Amino acid sequence: MRIKTTSLVIALLALFDLSLFGAEPPKNFTVGEFTFTRPANWESVEVTSSMRKAQLKAPGADKSQSAEVVFFHFGEGNGGGTKANVDRWLGQFEEKSNPKVEDVTVNKRRVTYVEVEGTYMSGMPGGPRTPQPKSMLQGAIIESTAENVFVKMTGPTATVKGAKEAFKKMVEAPLK
């Protein structure tokens, strides 16, 4: 009887996510030559594409209101230039309002910030698109000697606006 009870307990534990027992994803992660620290209340999630080097979730008012934060680094000679990526990101929105592009220098590194609101056309390039109205993009392109790093946060406008300062702090911290 003791063996059956032990087996049952093991089987039940296997059904639960073992991360509930203290295993927490690392707070620091490296993309290209930069080591980033995820904001404390953001969640590390498994990347959903081989093109993504890291993926986070910024919380919203509820789970359906969270924003997706993705990191890309394509390696030397790949990924396109800053202008091409800014244009592509802006092109992912219909009914755009308030598009902003700003270049800043952090410790001799150029960072191009992109911000746009409107209807985000979610989906893989060349594939079907799903319109997501009342959305916002906050993006950053970090210029690097080893090729640019691209960071893009998309989600409901209120969530992205609320996470903007944490996003900028996360992007700029490895440059200081």
Positions of PLM-derived features:
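Solvent-exposed, acidic/flexible segments
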Residues: 64, 78-82, 131-134, 144, ...
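Cleaved targeting-peptide boundary
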Residues: 21-29
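Bacterial N-terminal signal peptides
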Residues: 7-19
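Signature of long, low-cysteine stretches enriched in small and polar/charged residues
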Residues: 40, 50-53, 86-142
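Secretory pathway targeting signatures of secreted, lumenal, and periplasmic proteins
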Residues: 34-93, 102
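Positively charged n-region of N-terminal signal peptides that target proteins for export
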Residues: 1-5
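Surface-exposed amphipathic alpha-helical segments
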Residues: 36, 42, 145-176
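Solvent-exposed loop/turn segments at secondary-structure junctions
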Residues: 76-79, 118-122, 156-160
